[in-house]
């Protein structure tokens, strides 16, 4: 065990591995991305659209008298005008002004004019990686999407094809498809299949010789089967017998020629057109050429037929007919259409990352192309890389992609289609013995081939025939199978960070503004008379970008329950959102954990609902490269020795390496101890010699997110319970009295430090002043000497602390100093705690003495029995701050007035209001002073509409002025069920906030802090997914107690462990007790935590010293103790597991959920009570409840529930009057919902009428 420093505390760590890589800044992904957007991305967008020409210049430059061009040269970001705290208080957006230097050029004279123009305000990121939009803190979540690139998918197998597709960032998909039945290559254009060779003719390969030369294959000249199988193929080289040429390039391989070649010793191989390419060529001829050589099938051809018969024009027109059958084919329209589809940068964009992925995917195919087609030396060819830079498709991209299909075709067929082995053997025999001798069809025309076999040999399986062909032709090659690309592999997915998301939005909107700028350019007559600022009016763009922050699915209201929830939200990765997957998607593979996520995305932390697997969290060490691909670090291993060199690898780069876990034993020098070790390679786990190992994990925490790495003994918990533990830590309410866990993982300090709420020293120094609101540190130099400026004044850093700030979820953000005057602090040391932190460490809950035992049924269904001691000591007490606001508006009848002069209100309700009618700070307010009276926070009156005034009223008005006027009380009152202390009041008018809103004269916000103690129904949880609600609060003297008389503080259900398989909580309980007894703080890092014997033996020894060992076994310690019943003093039947567990109080507080209503608001349309606490609604009497009352025969109860208690307006008024007058309640009337039903049926043109039992029509409008 070793000691590690965690904030201002030292922990004893059980971790054994050395971690050479410090944990990075956990919020840097957000900060770096947005900084890059402001510094580079903004200018990239402006330059992409520069220069913008006037319309005259663009259409006719030479004839134009005055053509102008506008160009953006640089951008500049100003300083924020208002600080973040003021923005939150006033409901403003924290933003910065952006400026651009623009240059206007007269294209005719060459005269230029440069000017810096103001573009508008854009939201600015705070130091903590958040945005403040309209006063609310928000986070832009990272989005993970399939990367643009080239993919060969197994989805084509379902259509019994091989295929790949180019996926661009913007534009249409281009598919390359091989149909093994036809033996033809196709291009998928706009969802339609066309012959690939036709398409190649339109993109630069005009001659058939050029196209056929792209697809060579080599035959072994000594393999009789192979040669005979390829009779009819086109030769791609001259063939010599000694010095005599026996066949020329472009001749046909005949049976006679094949037999002759077999007899020549000097020929090792012959080069022919790949049979599929030849078949594609022949199908193209059939498609376009009207003439054919019918009746010549029986004759053996020796020369190629139809070479260059199909022209480029034919190709264009045939493709256009296929793609746009409703239009008349015209050559210019066809050219323009195809060009726009894949080769026009304005319509098609692969993006830089897409081009990188295409180049990477085509790298090996390019090397083979150089060797086979260009004839380069293999050694030289392997040194070359495919380095295309164009962001649109190039002809060679398509050729190389189609050549890759041959590899799938050659190597995978028998694997991909299930073929009966007996039938396959039979077919191979037929091929060898009979078919090769009698062959009459093209080598890969399956349709003809199958018909021959059906007719001659009685074979029915198409796939079997094809498999036999492939098997015979490859029988001596032993080619390895190649895998398909999968969208779920992280090598094929990239992360769009906040900067890229905003940049994409900005680019989309600027494309619209370009036209408006262009139109203004056409109106210019002279450079001297124009202001560039007047040309550029992109405020609408900026306002729409601001709208992106306010409305986009990926810009989310920040989860601010505690520092961990905020940190996790910033590191969240979402697969849903614009351009991503849909939540309703039934693609379960996309939700699964994929092996490529190791060290990049956490396999544990994800929501439990509809978003499971779609929303994930970044692993601790994960980084994002310039293309948006996730990388994870590894330590390099050389000859079985682990070095400290750290290498970051992308998911696809990792595939070929053997990687061992961080727990692998190594000696002091880094040499791996075992001779054979367990290593990962791709998705395989294998045992390899240590010399073959390439890399080692940098840490055992590497695969997990921050939340998951905060769970001690994670390795002993079932994954689904660990998921709940991760999620529930984010829901823990910051407590009044914080306490770090006795059993931590060492990550508590890192999480708190990166949350932004722990104040860290920016420089070394000595604390000069400390109070509740600030800390002043006198800086020191490297030698520890105090620093002074030129005038002899001390150089000090002043740290202002946040006091009683409300979070997004109404929890309290409060910072308090943890240093004393005179303390020396180093740079990076914590000097003040934030919410849910203790001595610089994350402290989400409290260490509680728990016992696992049943107690009078109060443990039923995971319920928790707690001691009154927890309330007395304020252990789970939390402060919640709610804000209430009201506006004084200008109405049609006059202005509303904020005043203490409210009609018909008791003095009791007005006693805490000041002379302006606003509650005083410090007042304690409760929601109910009496029946129906709620505390007034802001007194407000609204003018009432008046009819004709009587003479008496006119006299009163003249004597008392406006006080005699009739007003309505519209005061802001405290909602039901709330009580607390007013801690702050903000009053704003138009002078304070310019954008206060139309007709708003004054805005008042009242902040009320309420103290929530632990109560029955509150939800508590541990860190292992163990959760329950408080069932009862017992006096501490009734709680079970230890042999020394100490009562336990909480009783948990032991049945919650075996089936849930989260045994980590038991180990935590034992180690927690050991920590408490020894006064130490432990760190048990994930996957290298304390072992049982390291806990139970020392625990027994410590308990024995204190006489607490009763019930434990010295020879085989189990950590159990004999407890006694607090009520009787009798011992319980069996020893019980007792110890200290870290428990959290979650934000699901019973008091906030409980709600009751007698009468209240009704829905306008169907007149039924509203639903939910927020609307002061009633409980729904659903159909099942109606069935229950029907079954019970409670007719009268049912009648009044469906009418006067629900939506019978007349009936409920009559019932109210009857109750007041102490009379019998009258018969109920017609429910309003029935009237609505009748109206809807009449709206459907159905004449619905009502009749009574005597056949008389009832008018429901009068009833």
UniProtKB/Swiss-Prot annotation:
The record lists the catalysed reaction(s) as:
RNA(n) + a ribonucleoside 5'-triphosphate = RNA(n+1) + diphosphate
Q: Which PANTHER family match?
A: DNA-DIRECTED RNA POLYMERASE I SUBUNIT 2
**Any one GO molecular-function label of the UniProt entry:** DNA-directed RNA polymerase activity
What the record says about family reads:
Belongs to the RNA polymerase beta chain family.
Q: What class of enzyme is it?
A: transferase
**Name of the protein in its database record:** DNA-directed RNA polymerase subunit beta
**InterPro entries, sorted:** DNA-dir_RNA_pol_bsu_ext_1_sf, DNA-dir_RNA_pol_bsu_external_1, DNA-dir_RNA_pol_su2, DNA-dir_RNAP_su2_dom, DNA-dir_RNAP_su2_hyb_sf, RNA_pol_bsu_bac, RNA_pol_bsu_CS, RNA_pol_bsu_protrusion
Query: Quaternary state and partners of this protein?
Result: The RNAP catalytic core consists of 2 alpha, 1 beta, 1 beta' and 1 omega subunit. When a sigma factor is associated with the core the holoenzyme is formed, which can initiate transcription.
Top-rank lineage group of the source organism: Bacteria
Q: Which UniProt keywords apply?
A: DNA-directed RNA polymerase, Nucleotidyltransferase, Transcription, Transferase
């Amino acid at each position: 065990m070793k000691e590690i420093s965690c904030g201002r505390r030292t922990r004893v760590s059980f971790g054994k591995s050395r971690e050479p890589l410090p944990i990075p800044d956990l919020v840097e992904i957000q900060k770096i991305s947005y900084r890059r957007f402001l510094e580079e991305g903004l200018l990239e967008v402006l330059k992409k659209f520069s220069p913008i020409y006037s319309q005259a210049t663009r259409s006719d430059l030479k004839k134009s008298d005055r053509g102008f061009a506008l160009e953006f040269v640089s951008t500049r970001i100003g300083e924020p005008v208002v600080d973040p705290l003021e923005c939150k208080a006033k409901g403003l957006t924290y933003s910065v002004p952006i400026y651009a230097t623009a240059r206007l050029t007269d294209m005719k004279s060459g005269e230029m004019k440069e000017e810096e123009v103001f573009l508008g305000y854009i939201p600015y990121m705070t130091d903590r990686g958040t945005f403040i939009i309209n006063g609310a803190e928000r986070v832009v979540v990272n989005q993970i999407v399939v990367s643009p690139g080239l993919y060969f998918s197994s989805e084509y197998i379902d259509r019994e094809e091989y295929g790949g597709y180019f996926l661009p960032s913007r534009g249409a998909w281009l598919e390359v498809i091989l149909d093994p039945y036809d033996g033809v290559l196709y291009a998928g254009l706009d969802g339609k299949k066309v012959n690939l060779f036709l398409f190649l003719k339109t993109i630069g390969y005009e001659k058939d010789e050029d196209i056929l030369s792209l697809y060579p294959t080599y035959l072994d000249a000594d393999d009789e089967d192979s040669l005979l199988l390829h009779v009819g193929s086109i030769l791609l080289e001259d063939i010599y017998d000694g010095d005599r040429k026996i066949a020329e390039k472009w001749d046909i391989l005949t049976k006679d020629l094949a037999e002759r070649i077999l007899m020549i010793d000097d020929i090792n191989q012959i080069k022919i057109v790949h049979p599929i390419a030849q078949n594609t060529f022949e199908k193209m001829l059939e498609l376009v050429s009207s003439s054919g050589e019918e009746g010549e099938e029986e004759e053996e051809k020796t020369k190629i037929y139809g070479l260059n018969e199909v022209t480029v024009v034919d190709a264009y027109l045939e493709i256009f007919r296929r793609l746009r059958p409703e239009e008349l084919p015209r050559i210019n329209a066809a050219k323009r259409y195809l060009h726009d589809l894949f080769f026009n940068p304005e319509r098609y964009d692969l993006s830089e990352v897409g081009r990188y992925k295409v180049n990477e995917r085509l790298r090996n195919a390019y090397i083979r192309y150089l060797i086979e087609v260009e004839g380069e030396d293999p050694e030289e060819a392997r040194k070359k890389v495919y380095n295309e830079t164009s962001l649109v498709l190039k002809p060679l991209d398509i050729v190389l992609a189609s050549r890759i299909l041959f590899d799938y075709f050659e190597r995978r067929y028998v694997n991909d289609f299930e073929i009966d082995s007996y039938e396959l053997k039979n077919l191979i025999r037929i091929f060898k013995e009979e078919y090769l001798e009698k062959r009459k069809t093209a080598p890969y025309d399956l349709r003809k081939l199958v018909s021959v076999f059906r007719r001659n040999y009685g074979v029915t399986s198409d796939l079997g025939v094809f498999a036999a062909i492939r098997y015979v032709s490859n029988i001596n090659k032993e080619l390895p199978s190649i895998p398909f690309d999968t969208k779920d592999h992280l090598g094929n997915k990239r992360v769009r960070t906040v900067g890229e998301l905003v940049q994409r939005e900005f680019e989309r909107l600027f494309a619209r503004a370009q036209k408006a700028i262009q139109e203004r350019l056409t109106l210019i007559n002279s450079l001297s008379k124009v202001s560039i600022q007047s040309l550029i009016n992109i405020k609408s763009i900026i306002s729409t970008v601001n709208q992106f922050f306010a409305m986009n699915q990926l810009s989310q209201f920040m989860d601010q329950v505690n520092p961990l929830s905020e940190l996790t939200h910033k590191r969240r990765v979402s697969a849903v959102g614009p351009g991503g997957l849909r939540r309703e998607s039934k693609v379960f593979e996309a939700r699964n954990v994929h092996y490529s996520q190791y060290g990049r995305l956490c396999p544990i932390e994800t929501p439990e609902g509809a978003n499971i697997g779609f929303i994930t969290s970044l692993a601790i060490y994960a980084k994002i490269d310039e293309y948006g691909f996730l990388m994870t670090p590894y330590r390099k291993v050389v000859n079985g020795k682990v070095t400290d060199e750290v290498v970051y690898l992308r998911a696809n780069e990792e595939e070929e390496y053997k990687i061992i876990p961080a727990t692998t034993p190594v000696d002091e020098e880094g040499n791996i101890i075992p001779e054979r070790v367990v290593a990962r390679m791709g998705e395989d786990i294998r045992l390899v010699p240590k010399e073959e190992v390439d890399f080692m994990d940098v840490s055992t925490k590497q695969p997990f997110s921050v939340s998951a790495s905060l769970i001690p003994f994670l390795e002993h918990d079932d994954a689904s319970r660990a998921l709940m533990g991760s999620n529930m830590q984010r829901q823990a309410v910051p407590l009044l009295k914080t306490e770090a866990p006795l059993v931590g993982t060492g990550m508590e300090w890192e999480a708190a430090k990166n949350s932004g709420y722990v104040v860290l020293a920016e420089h070394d120094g000595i604390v000069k002043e400390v109070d509740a609101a600030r800390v002043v540190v006198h800086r020191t130099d490297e030698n520890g000497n105090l620093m002074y400026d030129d005038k002899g004044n001390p150089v000090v850093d002043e740290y202002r602390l946040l006091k009683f700030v409300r979070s997004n979820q109404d929890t309290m953000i409060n910072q308090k100093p943890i240093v004393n005057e005179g303390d020396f602090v180093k740079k990076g040391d914590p000097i003040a705690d934030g919410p849910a932190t203790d001595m610089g460490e994350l402290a989400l809950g409290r260490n509680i003495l728990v016992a696992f035992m049943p107690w009078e049924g109060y443990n039923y269904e995971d319920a928790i029995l707690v001691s009154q001691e927890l309330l007395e000591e304020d252990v789970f007490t939390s402060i919640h701050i709610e804000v209430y606001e009201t506006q004084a508006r200008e109405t049609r009848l006059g202005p509303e007035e904020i005043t203490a002069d409210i009609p018909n209100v008791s003095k009791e309700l007005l006693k805490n209001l000041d002379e302006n009618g606003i509650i005083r700070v410090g007042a304690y307010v409760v929601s109910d002073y009496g029946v129906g009276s709620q505390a007034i926070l802001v007194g407000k009156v609204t003018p009432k509409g008046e009819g004709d005034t009587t003479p008496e009223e006119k006299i009163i008005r003249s004597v008392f002025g406006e006080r005699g006027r009739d007003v309505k009380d519209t005061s802001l009152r405290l909602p039901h069920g709330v009580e607390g202390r007013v801690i702050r009041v903000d009053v704003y008018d138009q002078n304070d906030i310019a954008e206060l809103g139309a007709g708003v004269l004054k805005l008042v916000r009242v902040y009320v802090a309420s103290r929530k103690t632990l109560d029955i129904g509150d939800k508590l949880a541990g860190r292992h997914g163990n959760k329950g609600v408080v069932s009862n609060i017992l006096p501490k003297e009734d709680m079970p107690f230890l042999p020394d008389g100490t009562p336990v503080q909480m009783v948990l259900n032991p049945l919650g462990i075996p089936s849930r398989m989260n045994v980590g909580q038991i180990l935590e309980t034992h180690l927690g007790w050991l920590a408490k007894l020894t006064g130490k703080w432990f760190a048990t890092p994930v996957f290298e935590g304390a072992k049982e014997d390291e806990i139970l033996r020392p625990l027994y020894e410590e308990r024995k010293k204190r006489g607490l060992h009763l019930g434990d076994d010295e020879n085989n310690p189990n950590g159990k103790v004999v407890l006694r019943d607090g009520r009787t003093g009798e011992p319980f039947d069996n020893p019980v597991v007792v110890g200290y567990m870290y428990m959290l109080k979650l934000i699901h507080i019973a008091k906030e959920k409980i709600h009751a209503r007698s009468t209240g608001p009704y829905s306008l349309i169907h007149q039924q009570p509203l639903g939910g606490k927020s609307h002061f609604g009633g409980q729904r009497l659903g159909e099942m409840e109606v069935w229950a009352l029907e079954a019970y025969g409670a007719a009268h109860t049912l009648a009044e529930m469906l009418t006067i208690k629900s939506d019978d307006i007349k009936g409920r008024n009559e019932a109210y009057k009857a109750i007041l007058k102490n009379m019998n309640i009258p018969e109920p009337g017609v429910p309003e919902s029935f009237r609505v039903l009748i109206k809807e049926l009449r709206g459907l043109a159905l004449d619905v009428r009502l009749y009574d039992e005597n056949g008389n029509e009832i008018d429901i409008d009068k009833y």
